[in-house]
Regions:
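Short glycine-enriched loops at secondary-structure junctions
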Residues: 80-85, 136, 194-199, 323-324
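Aromatic- and glycine-enriched glycan-recognition loops and surfaces
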Residues: 54-63, 108-115, 136, 140, ...
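Mid-to-C-terminal alpha-helical segments outside catalytic/metal-binding sites
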Residues: 2-12, 21-76, 108, 115-123, ...
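Divalent metal-dependent hydrolysis catalytic cores, especially in the metallo-beta-lactamase
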Residues: 11, 46-54, 70-93, 127-133, ...
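Flexible loop residues that form catalytic
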Residues: 17, 82, 162, 195-196, ...
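Active-site-proximal, glycine-rich beta->alpha crossover segments in alpha/beta enzymes
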Residues: 81-112, 119-129, 134-135, 148-152, ...
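Catalytic pocket-lining loop regions of alpha/beta-barrel enzymes
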Residues: 127, 134, 140, 146-317, ...
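Active-site gating loops and adjacent loop-to-helix segments of metal-dependent hydrolytic enzymes
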Residues: 22-56, 92-103, 107, 198-216, ...
Length: 400
């Protein structure tokens, strides 16, 4: 018996990753950099297992990717980078900001990726929303890259992290007002992904990696209070900001803390000597969050989703993190059952598709037609998961 849109959920993942391989990126690179690229490519040793094994082609193989996502019940995706673009030491999400000397080559590298991504998304424009990359070393170049991304069919911009004391201004600096202005003008959401790009150098000590793992989330989370408390959303009242794969449990406490600090400052209890920014915010920080911010909740556990109502059910967007090992593929349907069984259908339609469609401009009608064939059944998601797949690798299945 055939099913209809009403029988199934439309699932758009707010967090997926893709990228070209080095041979593909070479085709998209400015010809002026080809000789240097060939020399760099000959020296480069890829440290990432998932970019060496059979799974690596999920990043760029159109047929494989669509087939696997259909089987997993996912019909749309927000596309973040994953592979290593020209002249980078690692993937962009975890790479530190380039030095002044590294900047020209790295800029050529992300522009090659952006060109590749525009073509990748154009192959399935209904199903893919790509995020163009920028670097913050040169604001004028970043603004130009944002305009290029909009003109070439991409759906938003990926905001890098800024580690302390790197020589690049922090995100709370007015330096970046031209970036916020052009994103507001173009109705281009600004998206910040969890990762190591904003983490300072931890040194080479026995506990360095432990400290990195403990603190990487904090350095990503900082972007939220940097933008809110510095008045970015007051100056740019139509700007949209998304935080993806950064967890959810920390957000209510962070908003409470910002509100408390703001309240104390405006009442003159403390902080006047530290600067006027928070004192001049006409409203509590949590109100700016409720109007401007969204959360890409990647592979949320049953406990994580308990925070969604405090965050705002119209602010949360589910993500699979395909094709990462910690993501829910190939058991996204089982993950949804584990985390969301018993939830109200209308609420889940918001979390699974409506919110992300609003932010990134997906055509829900077109995706509903695809989901009518492969989306998870509403009745299936409502049924609690009793047995976790034995080969599941996502923390969604093992976190409380």
């Amino acid at each position: 018996m055939s099913t209809t849109t009403a029988d199934r959920y439309t699932i758009i993942s707010s967090d997926c990753h893709a990228g070209g391989n080095h041979a593909q990126y070479r085709e998209y690179l400015d010809p002026a950099w080809l000789d240097e690229f060939d020399a760099w490519r000959g020296r480069y040793k890829n440290p990432f297992r998932d970019l060496q094994d059979d799974g690596r082609s999920r990043n760029w193989d159109d047929e494989r990717r669509i087939t696997e996502m259909d089987a997993d019940g996912i019909v749309g995706e927000v596309v973040f980078p994953n592979t290593v673009p020209p002249f980078f030491p690692t993937g962009v999400v975890i790479a530190p900001a380039p030095t002044a000397e590294e900047f020209p080559a790295r800029l050529a590298g992300i522009r090659a990726h952006n060109r590749w991504l525009a073509d990748f998304c154009a192959a399935h424009p209904t199903r893919r929303a790509g995020l163009g990359q920028i670097l913050l070393n040169d604001v004028d170049e970043a603004v130009a890259d944002i305009r290029w991304a909009k003109d070439h069919g991409l759906s938003g911009v990926l905001l890098p992290g800024v580690a302390p004391n790197t020589g690049i201004d922090p995100l709370y600096a007015p330096t970046y007002d031209p970036i916020w202005a052009v994103c507001q003008e173009l109705e281009f959401p600004v998206t910040h992904h969890g990762g190591g790009s904003g983490v300072p150098d931890m040194g080479r000590f026995p506990a360095s990696m432990t400290m990195y793992i403990l603190e990487v989330g904090f350095y990503a989370n900082r972007a939220l209070w940097h933008l809110i408390m510095s008045g970015v959303f007051d100056r740019f009242p139509e700007l949209v900001f998304v935080m993806t794969e950064q967890g959810t449990g920390w957000i209510p406490d962070a908003l409470d803390r910002m509100d408390s600090i703001h309240d104390s400052m405006v009442k003159g209890k403390f902080g006047g000597e530290l600067g006027p920014a928070a004192m001049q915010l006409p409203r509590p920080p949590s109100e700016y969050f409720a109007e401007h911010c969204y959360v890409g909740a990647s592979f949320p556990s049953a406990d994580d989703v308990n925070q969604f109502e405090r965050i705002g059910l119209d602010r949360v967007m589910w993500g699979s993190d395909y094709p990462h090992r910690e993501g829910t593929y190939p058991y996204s349907k089982e993950s949804l059952r584990l985390s969301f069984a018993g939830w109200d259908e209308a609420t889940l339609r918001r979390i699974f598709a409506e919110n992300v469609a609003k932010v990134y401009g997906f055509d829900l009608g077109a995706l509903d037609a695809i989901a009518a064939e492969c989306g998870p059944l509403v009745a299936e998601v409502a049924e609690p998961l009793e047995v976790i797949p034995t080969d599941a690798t996502s923390p969604a299945f093992f976190r409380p």
